[in-house]
Amino acid sequence: MHGGTTIAGTMVLARLAGIRVFATGGLGGVHRGGENSMDVSADLTELGRTRVAVVSAGCKGFLDIGRTLEFLETQGCLVSTFADGRTGNIDFPAFWTRGSGFKSPSVVQTEKEAAAIILAQEKLNIESGMLFANPIPEEFALPLPDIQAAIEQAVREADEKGFTGSKNTPYVLGRLKELTGDRAYVANKALVTANLIRGANVAKELSNLLSSTSQQPAKSL
């Protein structure tokens, strides 16, 4: 027997265990047609109420990314994307691709900057979570037109076959693997590895900040 937890479930467990940062693959979100079906991942509501920083490769590209970002804003969740060498307003990543067509609400340059944001939120006692989007390494990213065509086909087939609710995501992911071949598998491994490295570096920088803060002498009033 094997299994895993959702981002929402992992956030709850992390908060109980005192873990401030964790890395994952891709965030759940608002499904296409979610304005009618109300099919919205619990990942989003948990980000609105549980103070844990999540590092992910954005959200899966077959979701409604625009509505997902709007939902996170409503929940009061910070969403920031690592610039990863880019300048200006950059896209929120969409799992297999570095761009999504939707601009990131904010941009973070370094792991140290992300750690400072996490610490500031903790000091202010703001209880919502934080999402730091880490774009897939450029050499492993899938071409946006290719993956969009595969997504459209997989989502259409899921609708035609009645795969809704909890059955939708597994079907779409499985179909995308068939349509893209080994490219999606290789991209999955690359983005998870990149997220783990990024998350570990953020956690290390946060630990350094916490240590330096605790060693500072108390100020007299």
Language model: regions and residue ranges:
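General beta-strand structural signal in soluble alpha/beta enzymes
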Residues: 3-4, 21-26, 32, 54-56, ...
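Short coil/turn connectors at secondary-structure junctions
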Residues: 16-20, 24-27, 34-35, 41-42, ...
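Eukaryotic N-terminal low-complexity, Ser/Thr- and Lys/Arg-rich leader segments
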Residues: 209-221
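Ligand-binding beta-strand-loop-alpha-helix segment within the catalytic cores
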Residues: 1-20
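Glycine-rich beta-alpha junction loops
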Residues: 28, 58, 83-91, 133-140
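A C-terminal functional module that forms or caps the active site or interfaces directly
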Residues: 121-193
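Active-site glycine-rich loop that binds ribose-phosphate moieties when present
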Residues: 4-7, 35-48, 52-74, 111-116
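Anionic-ligand binding region
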Residues: 92-123
